[in-house]
């Protein structure tokens, strides 16, 4: 596949400022509003991220851990899930950059990471 840079899809519960800060640093960051998916279910958000080949960023640990298990159990692939604890947007971006600057999109495939 050879995808180098991780592109992110931000779940509805992630502050849109995170996307703005990432874009200012040259990263691709799609919000649920950008994708026209406001108020979509978690499964729909995940399917959208998969379709866009983007890693999903969320604060919703329980539901997205369950979705990751479902994808694994059913042999479905995804482009990664990053679960962030709630912090100010600048802190979330600081933590994200540790992954974005060290992990390729291919390495993120089917991974579940926590920041």
Residue ranges and their predicted role:
Residues 1-12, 16-19, 23-24, 37, ...:
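Acidic, PIN/NYN-like endoribonuclease modules and their adjacent C-terminal/linker elements
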Residues 28-40:
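Conserved BB-loop
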Residues 31, 56, 83:
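Short catalytic-loop micro-motif centered on adjacent basic/acidic residues
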Residues 42, 48-67:
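Acidic, metal-binding active-site segment of PIN/NYN-like and related structure-specific nucleases
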């Amino acid at each position: 596949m050879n995808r180098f840079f991780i592109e992110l899809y931000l779940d509805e519960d992630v502050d849109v400022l995170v996307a703005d800060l990432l874009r200012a640093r040259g990263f691709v960051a799609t919000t649920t509003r950008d994708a026209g998916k406001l108020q979509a279910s978690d499964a729909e958000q995940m399917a959208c991220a998969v379709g866009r080949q983007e890693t999903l960023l969320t604060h919703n640990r329980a539901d997205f851990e369950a979705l990751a298990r479902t994808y694994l159990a059913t042999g479905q692939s995804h482009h990664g899930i990053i679960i962030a604890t709630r912090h100010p947007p600048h802190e979330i971006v600081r933590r994200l950059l540790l992954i974005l600057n060290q992990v390729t999109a291919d390495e993120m495939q089917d991974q579940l990471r926590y920041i």
